[in-house]
């Protein structure tokens, strides 16, 4: 069982998961017929319609997970206070949360790669991501993070990004977290976080639990994932005014 994951792999998983989830939230509430929403021209148009929202929502969503990956809680609070004192914006906060120039440059590279793909009409596939995500320079010291914490942070990014995509595409009322979309997002997120190749589900026979166990790689990791889903769900209902009646957790 994987006990630790290198931070570059986690960073790449967080960024891809944000773009997959945020774009899915927007697309789920598109006026286009459901069977046509994922066509490249419609994906591209959906992202162009919300172009100005992407960076602000990205910074707001990714700051805490990045900071939690690199700092202790007390240090995060200090970083926020110091940034406020300097008048830093969210971009500046996120740069500080990266903790090193190399990690910040990796984040920027992943941001550009994922956003460019969506503007071209597609999300970066799991296989393409695992082949091409930004690695550390050869010979560089690479810090590791406990796999449990990495899973929790990734789940948080998926659910917050999806919810915020929904909110930006709903004019009135509470947006609905769609169960099928959330399952797909989490399957892909766990795949890119915990594996080095795209999962094949031929032997799962459409059994969702078997699919999740495959990408989570253990019952323990699956439990960590679902527990974080419950915690994040409660936050979304209270803070983001999300209607979660269609989710699997409640």
Tell what function each PLM region has.
Residues 1-8, 13-59, 66-155, 165-250:
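Extended non-catalytic scaffold regions that mediate assembly and binding
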